[in-house]
Design a protein with these regions (language model features):
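Central antiparallel beta-sheet cores of small beta-barrel/beta-sandwich binding domains
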Residues: 59-60, 64, 75-164, 194, ...
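Intrinsically disordered, low-complexity regions enriched in polar/acidic and amide residues
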Residues: 45, 50, 97, 151-152, ...
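Edge beta-strand at a domain terminus
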Residues: 163-203
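Bacterial N-terminal signal peptides that target proteins for export
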Residues: 1-11
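Amphipathic/hydrophobic helical signal segments and adjacent flexible N-terminal regions
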Residues: 11, 20-91, 186-203
Length: 203
């Protein structure tokens, strides 16, 4: 996920972006000509766009609120399985802080492997990223008693990743799923979920 992108992948991404923007501009121009302002079709299109913006803003506000609630010191434990079903258990400690509005940081140590780690994630201008790797928030909802349910997804050079989390006051339960993209990395294997739990805050 953190590997440097190749020149071709960057050029490919730029080509897709330019093509997409050009298509969107022509499509919008043609749609505006077919549906002049004030017509029922144009009004419906504007209503859909406004609704989409409102939903994105609501999801972003929910996501920031849920992450802000998790600030503090945590112990964590969990296990993950490779495509062959071999399980590895892990545990550690970390501290979650807010670097700036909408940006968060976790510093900790994996006690099982005796290695330290640092992750930074946040949202800016409607775009989400962790350690400069973009991701999407597919769902965020605030449940009873101030609990949250979140679904995040992203695609890297090695595969697709989905992260589902239940945030409560004294614990966080994460279920992660990874699907490799290449045959060499067992592309035929289905999603193999693995669990991580943030236990009661360190006293």
């Amino acid at each position: 996920m953190n590997r440097m992108k190749t020149l071709w992948s960057v050029l490919g991404a730029l080509a897709i972006l330019i093509t997409g923007n050009t298509f969107a501009a022509h499509h919008e121009k043609g749609e505006s000509a077919a549906n002049p302002p004030g017509t029922p079709s144009a009004n419906a299109r504007q209503a859909r766009a406004a609704q989409a913006r409102a939903m994105r803003a609501s999801t972003e506000a929910c996501w920031i609120k849920s992450n802000t609630r998790q600030l503090g010191d945590w112990e964590f434990s969990g296990e993950w399985s490779n495509p062959q079903g071999v399980r590895t258990r892990f545990n550690g400690e970390m501290t979650v802080t807010q670097k700036s509005p909408g940006t968060f940081q976790a510093k900790g140590k994996n006690l099982s492997r005796d290695n330290e780690f640092e992750n930074v994630w946040g949202v800016k201008d409607g775009k989400y990223a962790m350690n400069d790797n973009p991701f999407t928030v597919a769902h965020c909802s605030e449940l009873e008693n101030g609990n949250f349910f979140i679904v995040q997804q992203w695609t890297g050079q090695n595969g697709e990743f989905e992260w589902k989390a239940f945030f409560a006051a004294d614990h966080v339960t994460n279920v992660n799923q990874f699907r490799p993209l290449s045959i060499e990395e067992h592309n035929e294997a289905p999603y193999a979920p693995f669990l991580t739990r943030w236990d009661t805050r360190v006293k």
